[in-house]
């Protein structure tokens, strides 16, 4: 266990290096996970020898547990119910069937290459099916990428652990022979798969209601509201674990309750949670870098590298190609979504769960996971900026179907019979006399760049971002103005 001075040094490294490196990382074929995993390798036993950690070290377990609980909670809170319902088929197919196909392909690869047992192969396949939102962050924030594609990647990365985690918990129970009868399995299912989410949802709902009422009555300081959000995560985790449920599923359920019940809570809760989560994730990358550098000696390197190639270049693209073959997206979008399914911190955290559960051979599985994750972080992190730019330029040069997802028609949802077309001459007359309408230039990227003509006073909104703009505009203006405002969407 590292001493207090070492712990402070690690915290200092996370805070200073992340801030200084962020500007360079945004412009270079790099990512912060590459930087911090590399820092872990550097200070580990096979580097400078500053820090030595084992897979079962208490510091690693504590940081990893907090990180995964926070990540799951925040992923759920960010899921706006309306946005997920209207997201379309693409993210749902990637999340469900796509994830299961990756599990199967990775499992077969592990079984053939590593000679692991069926259960061990399934554990490894499940661990390696987790998509990392940290490595994807630069991609999903790039506004040159159509919103529907970014949303597909974001929803999948943010929620596929909820598909994977129950599978992993069942496999851990099988590996440890925790249940041997029908009654035993029924009790396990209730405790882990139902009790945890139920406890988490109840705590998330109750805590949100309490803070909403307290803030309305006493105007709670944003500082304390920010801390309250972290407390809700920890409370949900602890209560679920104490009652025999799963704390991680409880953390997600607590966040989901906050999202769908839509209490009027301070944005600071999410902002501070994301800041805390970011620091915990980067610290986790350092610690895992230290551990992985030591475990590499135990991993069958060549088979592990071959498995990494299968997971990255075969399993993910194959799964996405199958599930999206009839989706309304271009081949470029299929290739883009198929490529950006990086394995990262989430896979390492899931592997650590297996180690902590005492599964036989778990450290070997974690060593292989470390090899695959290292390859993925380097390859996907290095390709994020150039491939995003390449796809963005392609979108600006042509009209792709995914750019029309979430298009201007959404702004008139619920009033389709009132939607009328207006000719340019009619629009000119309306603009000259009477209360002017709000004109939105919603042409696709390629047409907007090619045709430099502009309507005076028009607001530029990309076609895939109209619904998001409409929600924000309605929130910012009084209801009387919203109801009386005429809107004209200009497209080609």
Where in this protein do the model-derived segments appear?
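Short acidic-hydrophobic, aromatic-tinged amphipathic segments that line or gate anion-handling sites
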Residues: 461-462
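Transmembrane helical cores of multi-pass secondary ion antiporters/exchangers
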Residues: 1-402
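Substrate-recognition/cap helix-loop segment adjacent to the acidic, metal-dependent catalytic center
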Residues: 76, 451, 455
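Catalytic cysteine-centered active loop of the rhodanese-like fold, especially the PTP/DSP P-loop
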Residues: 470, 474-492
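A short acidic, often aromatic-flanked loop/helix-cap motif at beta-alpha or helix-coil junctions
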Residues: 465-469
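Flexible, polar/low-complexity N-terminal or interdomain linker segments that lie immediately upstream
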Residues: 385, 389-452
């Amino acid at each position: 266990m590292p001493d207090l001075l070492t712990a402070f040094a690690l915290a200092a490294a996370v805070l200073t290096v992340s801030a200084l490196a962020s500007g360079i990382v945004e412009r270079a074929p790099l990512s912060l996970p590459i930087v911090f995993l590399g820092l872990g390798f550097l200070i580990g036993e096979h580097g400078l020898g500053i820090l030595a950690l084992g897979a079962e070290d208490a510091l690693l377990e504590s940081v990893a547990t907090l990180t995964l609980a926070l990540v799951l909670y925040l992923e759920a809170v960010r899921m706006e119910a309306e946005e997920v319902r209207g997201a379309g088929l693409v993210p749902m197919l990637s999340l469900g069937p796509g994830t299961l196909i990756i599990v199967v392909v990775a499992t077969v690869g592990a079984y053939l290459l590593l000679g692991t047992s069926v259960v061990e192969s399934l554990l490894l396949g499940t661990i390696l099916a987790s998509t990392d939102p940290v490595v994807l962050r630069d991609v999903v924030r790039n506004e040159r990428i159509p919103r529907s594609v970014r949303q597909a990647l974001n929803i999948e990365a943010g929620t596929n652990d909820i598909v994977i985690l129950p599978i992993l918990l069942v496999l851990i129970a099988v590996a440890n022979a925790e249940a041997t009868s029908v009654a035993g399995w029924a009790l396990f299912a209730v405790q882990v798969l139902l009790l945890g989410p139920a406890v988490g949802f109840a705590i998330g709902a109750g805590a949100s209601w309490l803070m909403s009422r307290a803030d309305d009555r006493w105007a709670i300081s944003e500082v304390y509201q920010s801390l309250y959000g972290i407390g809700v995560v920890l409370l949900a985790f602890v209560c679920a674990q104490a009652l025999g449920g799963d704390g991680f599923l409880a953390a997600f359920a607590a966040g989901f309750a906050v999202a769908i019940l839509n209490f009027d809570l301070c944005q600071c809760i999410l902002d501070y949670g994301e800041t805390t989560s970011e620091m915990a994730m980067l610290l986790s990358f350092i610690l895992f870098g230290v551990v992985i550098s030591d475990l590499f000696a135990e991993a069958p390197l060549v088979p592990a590298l071959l498995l990494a190639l299968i997971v990255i270049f075969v399993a993910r693209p194959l799964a996405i190609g199958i599930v999206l073959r009839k989706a309304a997206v271009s081949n470029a979008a299929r290739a883009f979504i198929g490529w950006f399914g990086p394995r990262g911190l989430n896979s390492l955290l899931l592997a650590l769960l297996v180690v902590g559960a005492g599964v036989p051979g778990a450290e070997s599985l974690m060593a292989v996971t470390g090899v695959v994750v290292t390859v993925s972080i380097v390859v996907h992190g290095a390709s994020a900026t150039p491939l995003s730019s390449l796809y963005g330029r392609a979108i600006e040069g042509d009209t792709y179907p995914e750019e029309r997802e979430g298009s201007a028609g959404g702004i008139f949802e619920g009033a389709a019979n009132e939607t009328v077309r207006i000719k340019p001459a009619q629009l000119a007359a309306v603009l000259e006399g009477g209360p002017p309408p709000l004109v939105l230039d919603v042409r696709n990227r390629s047409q907007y760049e090619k045709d430099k003509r502009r309507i005076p006073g028009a607001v530029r909104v990309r076609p895939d971002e109209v619904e998001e703009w409409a929600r924000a505009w309605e929130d910012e203006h009084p209801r009387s103005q919203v109801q009386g405002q005429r809107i004209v969407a200009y497209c080609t």
